[in-house]
């Protein structure tokens, strides 16, 4: 394919994408395929000779689309949103064309510097404390990670290194292996499974703190665990506070937990993967109160801020906490400006070496939507979630299980878990809408998350009518 054909095919692909998204509402939101469906539709080996572009395009509808779950359908209410917008798609095209691997400033100055500036832009939108911003010569700063899971792992490994070095400075005879056995981290019993995985990868203990009646980690429970473990000779070093849990969008009490972490010299990491986008709205900024106590903070613009995956925003107060943990400096990566104090080499802020020009997506989206446009988008989703909540409350057969704060509604039929499992199975088998469940204490709960960029009140109303009709069918069957 030369540039002439690329121009033609590129325009065709833009048309295909626009047609796909314009018509996505007419496609079943969940695919009707069985595991292994695709292997029977494609050859077992790659072609020896080139195939035509026309053949590939035909196979998209024939082979790929039948197995796609349409995350951007206005009838997709599962998980949490995954962001999508035309400006971000255009930026991704440019990112692919430039094709740099921005591991250092010298590898692509624009890639590095735009990321630093965009992370400061976003930090200011969130009203983060100045300590988290890079500015012109700040000690902190932001970095784009691949996911919130990656950000949690980076923070844990940095905290582990920092604590071990502090302990060895005071007692040089202590080995890293001996200290690793004593290190312990903490998070809520409602935290994402990625926190547990970070502990597994990092080789440290992770303890779940029991949450309160609102599924929130509170100071008393954390303090009790810290004191018990210290008395047993363990060394607390890391706490993850979740703002907007995956199960029910609950919020740990940051204002209570933060001071304890600071008093104990424990690294405090905030995981706000979903909810963090809402903090750009003044009416939701209170949910981030206490961020000043944190050492690191993370949320995913690729969830709810119209920046396509992947783009996970992470800030730290002290960049040296990361660079001292991850610094590797082989001669083939060195460059003349790296010791100048004027640049950032993001390879020292992350797990992998390579990194894409992801800040282009932020630049395009922030400029083409503006802060007001992004705020309006968040507010629309929150309004729709409250509309759904109101519909549920009007039906005495159902109950709302947690406070609705942002774009997630947790609800269920009053009755047994089996009744709700049957309802969910009926909902997803019908393939008109898509939901996933959670478990809150001993209850099986349905989650209704407002996700699509194009979802409107009419879609919410139709979804509720569908759920209500299926519920009637399930309840009738139970009585028979």
From Swiss-Prot:
Outcome recorded upon mutating residue 192 to A: Abolishes decarboxylase activity
Residues bearing the modification N-acetylmethionine: 1
Annotated metabolic or biological route of this protein: Catecholamine biosynthesis; dopamine biosynthesis; dopamine from L-tyrosine: step 2/2
Binding site for pyridoxal 5'-phosphate: 148-149, 246, 300
Claim: Acetylation is one of the keywords in the record: yes
CDD domains: DOPA_deC_like
Region (2 X approximate tandem repeats): 58-178
EC numbers, comma separated: 4.1.1.28
Modified residues (N6-(pyridoxal phosphate)lysine): 303
Keywords: Acetylation, Catecholamine biosynthesis, Decarboxylase, Lyase, Pyridoxal phosphate, Repeat
InterPro entries xref list: Aromatic_deC (IPR010977), PyrdxlP-dep_de-COase (IPR002129), PyrdxlP-dep_Trfase (IPR015424), PyrdxlP-dep_Trfase_major (IPR015421), PyrdxlP-dep_Trfase_small (IPR015422), Pyridoxal-P_BS (IPR021115)
Top-level taxon of the source organism: Eukaryota
Protein's GO biological process: aminergic neurotransmitter loading into synaptic vesicle; amino acid metabolic process; carboxylic acid metabolic process; catecholamine biosynthetic process; catecholamine metabolic process; cellular response to alkaloid; cellular response to growth factor stimulus; cellular response to xenobiotic stimulus
Family: Belongs to the group II decarboxylase family.
Subunit (UniProt): Homodimer.
Listed name of the protein: Aromatic-L-amino-acid decarboxylase
Organism lineage: Eukaryota, Metazoa, Chordata, Craniata, Vertebrata
